[in-house]
């Protein structure tokens, strides 16, 4: 893949704060670096074969750096690297080194994190730390190997557990474990996952099963709601206290009687659209305002055509100021709510897939 020279991208404009039409500031960028994954989780990408983004369209490290500089100029302070499975990308350490060098008051970047399924993590965690990664989130839906195989359609449970333990051994802090909770699949493991998280210095976040692109088996009866989760955990632990919320993060956090904390992301039954400050960039440079967005703004094409930093700042600023997306709220308001997008539609456009837009 040929990488264009970017001579005009080295002098970022002063930072500005941009509001959309719902008065939501831009603050969080989810940066997908690859659309491929080595699992086939039934709630995300259950099919065995997919149409992948053309490899020549994937942003290079230099292009990623240039586009991130654009977002930092308009108020983004948090960047989370996602996939697909980001650890599959061979030059991920270079991406992390490049972005971690931007963390600091001058750029406005306060947080650099990564979300991974953990399969490759045990072998890569030291490299991530050396490259400057600040925080790691690992997806883990069950502590039972057979259930893991049923959910992910792969036999990699031991590798994920080893990866999570390696994160703790490497000295990372503020580690999160993300669990998608599905009735009949793993809803009876909530307390077990909290107990496991204690042993690896992590906090578990339980996520309601979402009907996003790729969730072609979604149904209301499979959703184990936030209310269901709290009721289940109170039977085990007693009174659970909600913790004050100080930012726009999607999780509501709670404390057990002994002070152990956990989070719940109730995007399906209690959407956080009103305060959502996040957007998504696909691995080939399509900027999406919402997880449910059907279309986006291509930033790769103007960048490769010679657009300057300020040109792209104008594009992003204009796009965000026009933003009205409240996808999860609109889905919740539907009387009859089924699968968001049929498989035929997803196969026609890989950008609609959950695994392409970073979850």
Swiss-Prot record:
Disulfide bonds: none annotated. [4Fe-4S] cluster 1 binds at residues 37, 41, 44. Pathway: Cofactor biosynthesis; molybdopterin biosynthesis. It catalyses: GTP + AH2 + S-adenosyl-L-methionine = (8S)-3',8-cyclo-7,8-dihydroguanosine 5'-triphosphate + 5'-deoxyadenosine + L-methionine + A + H(+). Its EC number is 4.1.99.22. It holds the Pfam family Mob_synth_C. Residues 21-241 form the Radical SAM core domain. Induction: Expression is positively regulated by the transcriptional regulator MoaR1. The gene is moaA1. Belongs to the radical SAM superfamily. MoaA family. Keywords: 4Fe-4S, GTP-binding, Iron, Iron-sulfur, Lyase, Metal-binding, Molybdenum cofactor biosynthesis, Nucleotide-binding, S-adenosyl-L-methionine. S-adenosyl-L-methionine binds at residues 43, 84, 139, 210. Binds 2 [4Fe-4S] clusters. Binds 1 [4Fe-4S] cluster coordinated with 3 cysteines and an exchangeable S-adenosyl-L-methionine and 1 [4Fe-4S] cluster coordinated with 3 cysteines and the GTP-derived substrate. One of its GO terms (cellular component) is plasma membrane. This is GTP 3',8-cyclase 1. HAMAP family: MoaA_B (MF_01225_B).
């Amino acid at each position: 893949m040929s990488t264009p020279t970017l001579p005009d991208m080295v002098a970022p404009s002063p930072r500005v704060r941009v509001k959309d039409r719902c008065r939501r500031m831009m603050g969080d960028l989810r940066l997908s670096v690859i659309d491929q994954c080595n699992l086939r989780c039934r709630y995300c990408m259950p099919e065995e074969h997919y149409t992948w983004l053309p490899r020549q369209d994937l942003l290079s490290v230099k292009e990623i750096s240039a586009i991130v500089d654009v977002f930092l100029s308009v108020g983004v302070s948090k960047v989370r690297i996602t996939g697909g499975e980001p650890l599959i990308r061979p030059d991920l350490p270079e991406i992390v080194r490049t972005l971690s060098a931007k963390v600091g008051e001058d750029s406005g970047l306060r947080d650099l994190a990564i979300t991974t399924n953990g399969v490759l993590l045990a072998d890569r965690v030291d490299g991530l730390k050396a490259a400057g990664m600040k925080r790691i989130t690992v997806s883990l839906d069950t502590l039972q190997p057979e259930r893991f195989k049923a959910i992910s359609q792969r036999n990699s449970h031991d590798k994920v557990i080893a990866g999570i333990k390696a994160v703790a051994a490497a000295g990372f802090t503020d580690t999160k474990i993300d669990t998608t909770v599905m009735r009949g699949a793993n809803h009876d493991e909530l307390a077990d996952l909290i107990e496991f998280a204690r042993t690896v210095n992590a906090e578990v976040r339980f996520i309601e099963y979402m009907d996003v692109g790729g969730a072609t088996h979604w149904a209301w009866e499979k959703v184990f709601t936030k209310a269901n989760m709290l009721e289940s955990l109170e039977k085990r632990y007693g009174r659970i206290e909600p913790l004050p919320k100080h930012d726009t993060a999607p999780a509501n956090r709670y404390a057990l009687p002994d002070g152990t904390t956990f989070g719940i992301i109730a995007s399906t039954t209690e959407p956080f659209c009103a305060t959502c400050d996040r957007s998504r960039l696909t691995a080939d440079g399509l900027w999406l305002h919402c997880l449910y967005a059907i279309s986006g703004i291509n930033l790769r094409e103007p960048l490769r055509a010679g657009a300057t930093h300020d040109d792209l700042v104008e594009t992003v600023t204009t796009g965000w100021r026009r933003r009205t997306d409240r996808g999860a709220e609109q889905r919740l308001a539907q009387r009859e709510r089924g699968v968001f997008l049929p498989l035929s539609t997803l196969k026609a456009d890989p950008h609609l897939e959950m695994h392409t837009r970073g979850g």
